[in-house]
């Protein structure tokens, strides 16, 4: 059966939920899905229940969201792709890959707890990876009777946003209850509609980098029997028409291929646009020829590099970072777009060490080439946790 064509009738916006573990991100995501499906039934607005969003098998055993779930829904104004970003500190790596895909995010804070350590870490990371707008869902508000406590929590959250240069004074803070909305309680169903109205009105229509040369980081690779190899990811910029020639850059020697098909949410597209999550079918490319961390680009537009100058913020101990300073010859992982690559740091002349909580300039030599350009962001990671975040300021080689 031929797949349905994807119709572009409304602005498309990528959003997500951030926040501390157990503050109710996934429950709220399920509530948004249900409330919109009930209020504005359409082919897009199909209710996704909690279990299907919280879907990877190891998640349920630990009661922690590990993978990133993509949920699709629409309001009368817009079409949304929503990523439920993981909340547990161990899985900040996924948070980085998820947050990099957001035009704005809903920071979920339980009214019963207020902002916690991971709430702060997510706001810090959101700023580092370039999430431009945050608004707040004060979840579990049904469980707090005291108006003063709600106002106090709201004040705390606003201060947290302002501390990372988000518009803390102006950001909408909407009191919601994901659980009560799922149960159909009218007051709290309305709160979710109010939240989505705030998202519609406060996360501007994204300006996509459509005019730049096409680039899509590879997140996943799989084989469709009889058709070939598909790479999936979010187009970072540019547009790509079916039957275009592309290069696959980074990690291995650059290779050329042709894109013979493009899909988004299981619907066929004639072309992929910046900001869209899509799958690209590659002609004559074997599954083992491509891997996560490479990028698919317009030929000649991006080159692979191993050494660069950058500036980075080293997280303090309170932010979940290192206890000890870093020195020249420190060898952490550098997380670019969708993958970790080991690199050796050289501090600038005259700098003996960098303390947690400081910002520093550095020169880095990676052990594998990465598709790189000035301004590219990275996280510095060690033993599975984020210890710093920065940007490439100059390419050396």
From Swiss-Prot:
Residues 10-207 form the tr-type G domain. It catalyses: GTP + H2O = GDP + phosphate + H(+). Residues 139-142 are annotated as: G4. GTP binds at residues 19-26, 84-88, 139-142. It comes from the Bacteria. It is an enzyme of class 3 (hydrolase). Its EC number is 3.6.5.3. The keyword Magnesium applies. GO terms for molecular function: GTP binding; GTPase activity; translation elongation factor activity. SUPFAM superfamilies: EF-Tu/eEF-1alpha/eIF2-gamma C-terminal domain, P-loop containing nucleoside triphosphate hydrolases, Translation proteins. Mg(2+) binds at residue 26. NCBIfam families: EF-Tu, PRK00049.1, PRK12735.1, PRK12736.1, small_GTP. HAMAP family: EF_Tu_B (MF_00118_B). Monomer. This is Elongation factor Tu. The lineage of its organism: Bacteria, Bacillati, Actinomycetota, Actinomycetes, Micrococcales.
């Amino acid at each position: 059966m031929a797949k349905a064509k994807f119709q572009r009738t409304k602005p498309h916006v990528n959003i997500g939920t951030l926040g501390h573990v157990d503050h109710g991100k996934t429950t709220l995501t399920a509530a948004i899905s249900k409330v919109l499906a009930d209020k504005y039934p359409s082919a897009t607005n199909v209710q996704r229940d909690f279990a299907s969003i919280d879907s990877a098998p190891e998640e349920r055993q630990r009661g922690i969201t590990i993978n990133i779930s993509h949920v699709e829904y629409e309001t009368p104004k817009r079409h949304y792709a929503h990523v439920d970003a993981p909340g547990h500190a161990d899985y900040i790596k996924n948070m980085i890959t998820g947050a990099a895909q957001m035009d704005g995010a809903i920071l979920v804070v339980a009214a019963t707890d207020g902002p916690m350590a991971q709430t702060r870490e997510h706001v810090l990371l959101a700023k580092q990876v370039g999430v431009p707008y945050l608004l707040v869902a004060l979840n579990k508000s049904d469980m707090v009777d005291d108006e003063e406590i709600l106002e106090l929590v709201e004040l705390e959250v606003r201060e947290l946003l302002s501390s990372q240069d988000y518009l803390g004074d102006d950001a909408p803070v909407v009191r919601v209850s994901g659980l009560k909305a799922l149960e159909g309680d009218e007051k709290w169903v309305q709160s979710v509609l109010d939240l989505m109205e705030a998202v519609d009105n406060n996360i501007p229509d994204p300006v996509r980098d459509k005019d730049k040369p096409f680039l899509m980081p590879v997140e996943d690779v799989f084989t469709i029997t009889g058709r070939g190899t598909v790479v999936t990811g979010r187009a970072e910029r540019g547009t790509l028409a079916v039957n275009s020639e592309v290069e696959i850059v980074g990690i291995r020697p650059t290779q050329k291929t042709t894109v013979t098909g493009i899909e988004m949410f299981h619907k066929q597209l004639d072309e992929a646009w910046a900001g869209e999550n899509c799958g690209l079918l590659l002609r004559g490319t074997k599954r083992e020829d491509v891997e996560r961390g490479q990028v698919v680009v317009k030929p000649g537009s991006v080159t692979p590099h191993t050494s660069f100058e950058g500036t980075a913020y080293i997280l303090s101990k309170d932010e979940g970072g290192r206890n000890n300073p870093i020195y020249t010859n420190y060898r952490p992982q550098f997380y670019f777009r969708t993958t970790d690559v080991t690199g050796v740091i050289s501090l600038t002349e005259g700098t003996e060490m960098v303390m947690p909580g400081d910002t520093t300039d550095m020169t880095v030599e990676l052990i594998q080439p990465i598709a790189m350009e000035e301004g590219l962001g990275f996280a510095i990671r060690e033993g599975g946790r984020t210890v710093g975040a920065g940007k490439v300021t100059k390419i050396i080689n």
